[in-house]
């Protein structure tokens, strides 16, 4: 509760409510605004846990946000391949595709496969007000398949106090983090504005997994009379990072095999696809760039002292790619991987253990039929917008009624484009073009299309759109 004046009388505020002052002469609140649904630990009849802001501040450091939930019963978070933003989150044994993840009550799971890429939310840790998990089927106010559970991440928004800060921190493996934040607090005219900007960069714990991440966040809200409030929130984390491919895992024997490459360092830091080209330039078959900003406009209507209506209109625009090694046949395509069946691959391998990208370049230079192996950027762009509205009514003490609807529309564009011919003259994508159905692409009617000589920027491997419309009630 916030109050103005010297007197601050007591007021009963429900656990999922945030109280704000009506005007500067107020000595107590007349209205209560619901900004996010939140259960009460040990009082709500669901298996739930909270992680508050203080705990996040104490433990985050250069860890990733899902790792803050590792002390939560039924939750298991891991760095997965070890690169920046590549964390995985399981709940009750279920993968993220069966765990509903929301930011301020807005769903963020991928619309196509249900998974989640935590690298898209690299800067979210600084914005967190609290995180709440519900294990198993619970009371989430969104129509999603969440048999594993629900994670709701609530950011600092309309409750931010006046002030700001600037920080710079360092950590192991070249980790650097600089950020600045400012908030006006609630003004006399009912406005509240908050913003945050930051940057993270470092070498990564795993060999050759350096990263750069920019973070931004803003929230602006306005009280409209006695019973209405609107809030506009936006955040994003454009990032790029080298990876250790999740399919390059080694067996116990395989890890011992690479011990000779690490010079006394932990064998588990070894990266099978770390390497350089002929001129000493950095090359990688495992690199990711992505930017997925999300914006939401919320309207909150306090109908009376027992009921409210919360409506959110949101939009997310995603753009980015991951490297995708291509080859004229499966043998060459698989050679881009650093391991197979738990064992290190030696197709293209130097004596020091680095991946021999220079040998790929030499292979293509010696070919009279164009490149045998090329690198492509596999784009996954999308535009996603939705509307989520929830009506809440307190029927009796300890008994609430919820009803609402959830509508979403999504278009994804999936294209792979050649980014590096690796010193070859051209590339032919006969491997995939030969199987294209003319009903899907009229160009396949031309027999010469399969043998087209392709260069940097040309499409290979895949080129399709996906359209999804989802609606539900609860």
Stretches found by the model and what they are:
Residues 66-107, 123, 129:
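Extracytoplasmic beta-strand/coil segments of soluble accessory domains associated
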Residues 163, 170-201, 206-245, 294-304:
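Transmembrane beta-barrel wall of Gram-negative outer-membrane proteins
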Residues 221, 229-296, 323-377, 440-454:
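Acidic/polar loop-and-plug regions of large Gram-negative outer-membrane beta-barrel proteins
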Residues 39, 96, 108, 156, ...:
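Structural signature of outer-membrane beta-barrel domains
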Residues 88, 107-135, 154-156:
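Short acidic/polar hinge/loop motifs at secondary-structure boundaries
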